[in-house]
A protein has these predicted regions:
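Ligand-binding clefts/hinges and TM-proximal coupling segments of bilobed small-molecule sensing domains
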Residues: 175-198, 262-301
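Bilobed "Venus flytrap"/periplasmic-binding protein-like clamshell domains
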Residues: 76-97, 159-214, 219-223
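Short helix-initiation/N-cap motifs at beta->coil->alpha
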Residues: 34, 105-116, 129-131, 191-208
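An extracytoplasmic/periplasmic, membrane-proximal ligand-sensing/linker region
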Residues: 61-63, 281-336
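Ligand-binding "clamshell"
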Residues: 48, 136-147, 224-237
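Pocket-lining segment of extracytoplasmic ligand-binding domains
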Residues: 196-283
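Short, Lys/Arg-rich nucleic-acid/phosphate-binding segment
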Residues: 52-67
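Beta->alpha turn/N-cap motifs
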Residues: 109-111, 121-134, 139, 199-200, ...
């Protein structure tokens, strides 16, 4: 795919860390002076470049100082397999239109693997459970949370005919937090928990043969369990969970660019809210979940674009999570 003029300008500037004459840009790119001037104004407004007057000429410098991961103007976004994130479609579109980034998406099977990839700089951005991100921040300080997302779609489900007392859920995730809240509130009468890592290989093929009494899962896994005679006990949102996955960034991306990505993300969520169905087909192909289930998920998940520390404190308090103290995690939230 041919680069846009903005992308060509940014790529050219990346080769000249000390700056380049504005007059050299249109000559190098063989683009008209007026078009280059227009593009530079846009990039300057976005804070991606700075122009310094030297005599009767301008020297143009890139202000984007990021880790090696973004040198190719490519952002790597990690998500967990779910029907939760159709809103990444407008986010990806706006990252290209406004900041000149192509986006490559990697779909992970669980929260730990996806968040670990962010900490190790294998991805630059990740939509993973807030609880997982907070503990990763506590251990490494190498990520920052840029914005909210959606909540809902997950539930505690029960097989009343099961002869076991076991609970099954994903580890160190929103489901794990939901399980704990359900135990605290008396919805689950078992303390024996088993974890699955990959829902596609560990849960779906085996649920017919090993009957766990309780399973805590997200959409569309809830639909699959209903087909196998599991019933709803309580939704995770009714237990007080108001954030599932939130957007986090590696600290290899500098603060200024993180701020711009956060702003683009909020605009993307707003655009998504106006017509969620517009993005169903694209997202269905990405994650391999049928369009019908993605359409259903739109009513299952509710937007929660901004970070509300009060809601987060309330959930931690209700879950009786005191290690680490929530106050020590506030540095993870960069833009609220």
């Amino acid at each position: 795919m041919e680069l846009t003029i903005k992308e060509k300008v940014l790529k050219l500037l990346s080769n000249y860390p000390e700056g380049i004459l504005q007059s050299s840009i249109y000559r190098a790119l063989k683009v008209s002076k007026s078009r280059v001037s227009e593009v530079l104004k846009d990039l300057e407004a976005l804070g991606l470049i700075v122009r310094v007057r030297v005599g009767n000429q301008y020297v143009v410098k890139s202000r984007v100082q990021v880790g090696d991961v973004l040198k190719g103007r490519v952002v790597r976004l990690g998500i967990v397999w779910s029907s939760e994130y159709p809103f990444i479609a407008p986010f990806i579109k706006l990252l290209k239109d406004r900041l000149g980034f192509e986006v490559r998406v990697t779909v992970y099977t669980n929260a730990i693997t996806a968040t670990s990839a962010l900490v190790r700089n294998e991805v630059d951005l990740a939509l993973t459970p807030l609880i997982t991100q907070l503990y990763a921040y506590s251990l490494t300080k190498s990520l920052r949370i840029l914005g909210g997302g959606v909540y809902g779609g997950s539930a505690v489900m029960v097989d009343k005919s099961s002869g076991t007392d076991e609970v099954l859920c994903s580890e160190f995730s929103t489901m794990d937090l939901c399980r704990l809240l359900a135990v605290n509130d008396g919805f689950i009468d078992s303390s024996t928990t088993k974890y699955f890592s990959n829902p596609l290989t560990d849960l779906l093929p085996n649920i017919r043969y090993r009957r766990f009494k309780y399973v805590v899962v997200w959409h569309p896994l809830t639909e699959y369990l209903r087909m196998h005679n599991y019933e709803y006990v309580v939704s995770c949102s009714d237990l007080g969970i108001r954030y599932c996955c939130t957007l986090a960034s590696t600290t290899a991306i500098d603060t200024d660019l993180r701020s711009k990505i956060s702003e683009v993300y909020q605009v993307a969520l707003e655009e998504y809210s106006r017509d969620p169905s517009k993005w169903v087909e694209w997202y269905s192909v990405l994650v391999g979940i049928s369009p019908d289930l993605i359409v259903k998920s739109i009513s299952e998940y509710k937007l929660q674009p901004y970070i509300d520390l009060g809601l987060i404190r309330e959930t931690f308090s209700k879950a009786r999570l005191g290690i680490p103290d929530i106050s020590s995690l506030l540095g993870a939230f960069e833009f609220r």
